[in-house]
Amino acid sequence: MDLTVEPNLKSLITSSTHKWIFVGGKGGVGKTTSSCSIAIQMALAQPHKKFLLISTDPAHNLSDAFGEKFDKDARKVTGMDNLSCMEIDPSAALKDMNDMAVSSAGENGNDDLGGLLQGGALADLTGSIPGIDEALSFMEVMKHIKKQEQGDGESFDTVIFDTAPTGHTLRFLQLPTTLSKLLDKFSEITGRLGPMLNSMMGSGNVDIAGKLNELKANVETIKEQFTDPDLTTFVCVCISEFLSLYETERLIQELISYDMDVNSIIVNQLLFAEFDQEHNCKRCQSRWKMQKKYLDQIDELYEDFHVVKMPLCAGEIRGLNNLKKFSQFLFKEYDPVADNTVIYELEEKN
């Protein structure tokens, strides 16, 4: 029986069970291009389903990649009926939180608190907290789950995350466990001080314990889903260089410690110089020799992974048409001989 793992993402692209797909790795290795490519291929392969691509990276690139503006509200990609994008903007989300807090304080008769928050005090305070970007991204996941449970608003079959560089992503993935422990402590405190805390919130009879229990239930749901390999997977993105390979291994070990499924690696920016005599040069040959050395290590280390080898293109991979051309090699692996002309056929984008 042949146990060779296919060097493509066909099984993921055609998956009918996955709800959450994370795409991450070291900065500058092509995470955004890879996440856009996965989202496009899934949307093309499963036209009856809806897909959402979310950027959790503070330096948002989805708008640049597609050549159209996205913001904190999901909006369809022009030319794709079943693919939407959104970029989580921490400053806008914090302003919304502050406005909601002001409104809530006013409704509950707590004018002093409302006056304090009116100047954006909550946004200023929370904006300076380390990891606030990851927390806001996590809130979007919770909102999405709530919508699905309640059948409220537009829901999506699969959410693909274009994540921030490795450190931010690991903090994001730790949030379910961290929040779960934190909420346990809060529940303990509210059990003892509930009536006093409720009186401090004003006359609105806010059930703090009830809200905490509801939040904890949502967090536990996410925790369960993130550790279910049928529902969630992580796709690592790297280039064939020492530092990128080292960070990819560190990332994979961390993901395994979180019980998260990871079995795919996209290796970007490969030259395949020996197959391209027309555009060959000494620098390309030297670079390709170095790339091959680390590719061999990747193949040896991750023989049970889907290792997808993607070519370095002659132009920028921007705009839907260029992304479609590039992304086809996730579904059917790139052939340096047969597909060589494709990497020189990208449209120029202003």
From Swiss-Prot:
Positions bound to ATP: 26-33, 241, 268
Enzyme class: hydrolase
Family, per entry: Belongs to the arsA ATPase family.
Subunit composition and interactions: Homodimer. Component of the Golgi to ER traffic (GET) complex, which is composed of GET1, GET2 and GET3. Within the complex, GET1 and GET2 form a heterotetramer which is stabilized by phosphatidylinositol binding and which binds to the GET3 homodimer. Interacts with the chloride channel protein GEF1.
GO molecular function, one term: ATP binding
Function field: ATPase required for the post-translational delivery of tail-anchored (TA) proteins to the endoplasmic reticulum. Recognizes and selectively binds the transmembrane domain of TA proteins in the cytosol. This complex then targets to the endoplasmic reticulum by membrane-bound receptors GET1 and GET2, where the tail-anchored protein is released for insertion. This process is regulated by ATP binding and hydrolysis. ATP binding drives the homodimer towards the closed dimer state, facilitating recognition of newly synthesized TA membrane proteins. ATP hydrolysis is required for insertion.
Binding residue positions for Zn(2+): 281, 284
Protein's GO biological process: cellular response to oxidative stress; pheromone-dependent signal transduction involved in conjugation with cellular fusion; post-translational protein targeting to endoplasmic reticulum membrane; response to heat; response to metal ion; retrograde vesicle-mediated transport, Golgi to endoplasmic reticulum; tail-anchored membrane protein insertion into ER membrane
Lineage: Eukaryota, Fungi, Dikarya, Ascomycota, Saccharomycotina
Keywords associated with the record: ATP-binding, Cytoplasm, Endoplasmic reticulum, Golgi apparatus, Hydrolase, Metal-binding, Nucleotide-binding, Transport, Zinc
Active-site residues, as the UniProt record annotates them: 57
Main location: cytoplasm
Subcellular localization, as worded in the UniProt entry: Cytoplasm; Endoplasmic reticulum; Golgi apparatus
Gene designation: GET3
Protein name according to UniProt: ATPase GET3
GO CC terms in record: GET complex; Golgi apparatus
Record organism: Candida glabrata (strain ATCC 2001 / BCRC 20586 / JCM 3761 / NBRC 0622 / NRRL Y-65 / CBS 138)
E.C. designation(s): 3.6.-.-
